[in-house]
Amino acid sequence: KELDLIDEIKFVHPKDMQDGKIEITSGDITTNLPYVDGVHLAFDHHLSESIRNEKRENHIIIPTAPSAARVVFEYYGGFETFPESFAEMMVAVDKADSAQFLKEDVLEPKGWEFLSFLMDARTGLGRFREFKISNYQLMMDLIDYCKNHTIKEIFALPDVKERVELYEKYAEAAKEQIQRCATQTKNVVVLDLRGEETIYPTNRFMIYALFPTANISIHIL
């Protein structure tokens, strides 16, 4: 959007792309999604996609890149094209897409890390209330807002603030619930929430921060 190359943005599910449910034309650019024939350009960083697909000129894939956003950023010239003010945001995007969070980022999230959790549907905030605008609409708004505002200014937005307040309201209850309902066997932790009247919202990495020797989790709902 910074380069005025797009006129419409859609967020779609990877499985819907694979199943052919999303109409793709030669005027489309896809990012962080499975490759589909007929697309103009497809950007990705998943090794599985480079294995699944034969090499194509319009499939811009760098398996060593920390994020698909980084692949797009470098393809279009990096900081020779984009403003230096994007630097902090790009580091945060790399961290979120590759899940390179520190334990404290997960337990007590702040800044860009916190924003990524708030915007992730898997955090579960939507189960608790109807926000003034949907997560989808907020994502669309933030595409423009993030270009010219600091993370502090982003968190001052009313639509972001109400999500922060809800997350923090249930933060301790969510941690207690995971510790009470989870059992670990070797490197696998099973979270059984079938008997819980309320499933409290928290980021999807919390279970690994609370059970740091586990690297696989199974959720029973």
Question: What are these model-derived regions, one by one?
Answer:
Residues 121-161:
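Long, charge-rich alpha-helical interaction segments
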